[in-house]
């Protein structure tokens, strides 16, 4: 290929051709007006296609109100919690329920910060411009994650309902919080490396790292509020459709002697409405997050494997892979996945 700069540049005569061609086609002008006024995505919407797209599904899970990650990178956390809340709602017959996403967000920030500083200690001999050290420093406490990270957090810290630890401005819109935290973590990394180069031993460096984690906790607590150690939980089970029906005498629980006499029935189904909510209640006082998870969530988060479809020549299918330096909870280990063909991936989603 030629290295002549003039041959590689955008030429003025071509620009004139481009603009002439653009203005010759009226469709381009209409599209430009629409995109400039409404935005590219709205302007590009095919409304005939929208009307033709079916909104009925062969598999549909009813799981309460819609959750919203807003302007944060917690998609993996919301998806994982929604998996558990579906099972919890059905197990305990609840109309709606939502876990606290902020609770896991707090501990994820703490754990990622700790793991980052540990990785810094593991790579003190790496050059600062090495690919490994650059990868470690890319986003020390960024929001992203996947199932194994979620499972590691739940195993260690449990879960709480949203009422016990609601959303905050910095969980809904995490950019400023994480930008500041990442900046401080990189400052800490630079000082650890400076102390190491000056001859500091492991004990001194670990003492310094523990002090830094105290600062990290303060940043997280100021930004998100402290997570609860214990909390109270109250919920009512939902009304069953059958409860609204009058007794017909065929139910085994019917207490009337004369099954043909509806007035003689003393079943709960025929009691007059009092206006008092008599649905069964779930009440917990001073329960811990781990106790809540073990008692009320009918799912073991460790009973899952991560599947991926990465059609790369260097990564053959049907093998398990581990990604170095990818842990959020350091003692839980790095992330692993099984690389499978797309048809296996689809079947797993349906099954």
Question: What are these regions, as identified by a protein language model?
Answer:
Residues 1-69, 77-351:
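Structured alpha-helical subdomains that flank or immediately precede key functional sites
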């Amino acid at each position: 290929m030629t290295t002549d700069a003039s041959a590689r540049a955008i030429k003025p005569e071509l620009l004139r051709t481009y603009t002439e061609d653009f203005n010759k086609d009226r469709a381009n002008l209409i599209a430009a007006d629409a995109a400039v006024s409404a935005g590219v995505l709205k302007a590009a919407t095919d409304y005939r296609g929208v009307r033709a797209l079916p909104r009925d599904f062969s598999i549909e899970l009813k799981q309460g109100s819609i959750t919203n990650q807003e302007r944060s990178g917690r998609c993996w956390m919301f998806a994982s919690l929604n998996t558990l809340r579906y099972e919890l709602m059905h197990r305990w017959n609840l109309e709606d329920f939502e876990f606290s996403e902020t609770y896991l967000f707090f501990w994820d920030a703490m754990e990622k910060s700790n793991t980052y500083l540990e990785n810094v200690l593991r790579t003190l001999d790496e050059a600062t411009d090495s690919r490994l050290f650059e990868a470690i420093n890319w986003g020390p406490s960024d929001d992203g994650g996947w199932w194994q990270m979620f499972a590691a957090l739940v195993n260690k810290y449990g879960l709480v309902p949203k009422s016990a630890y609601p959303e905050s401005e910095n969980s809904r819109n995490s950019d400023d919080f994480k930008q500041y935290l990442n900046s401080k973590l990189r400052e800490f990394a630079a000082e650890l490396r400076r102390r190491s180069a000056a001859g500091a031993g492991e004990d001194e460096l670990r003492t310094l790292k523990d002090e830094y984690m105290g600062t990290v906790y303060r940043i997280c607590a100021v930004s998100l509020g402290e997570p609860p150690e214990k909390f109270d939980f109250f919920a009512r089970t939902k009304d069953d459709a059958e409860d609204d029906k009058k007794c017909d005498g065929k139910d085994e629980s019917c207490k009337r002697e004369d099954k043909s006499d509806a007035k003689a029935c003393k079943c709960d189904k025929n009691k007059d409405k009092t206006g008092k909510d008599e649905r069964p209640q779930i009440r917990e006082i001073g329960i811990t997050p781990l106790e809540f998870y073990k008692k009320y969530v009918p799912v073991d988060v460790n009973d899952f494997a991560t599947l991926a479809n990465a059609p790369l020549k260097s990564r053959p299918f049907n093998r398990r892979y581990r990604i170095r330096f990818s842990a959020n909870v350091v003692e839980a280990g790095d992330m692993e996945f099984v690389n499978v063909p797309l048809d296996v991936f689809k079947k797993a989603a349906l099954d």
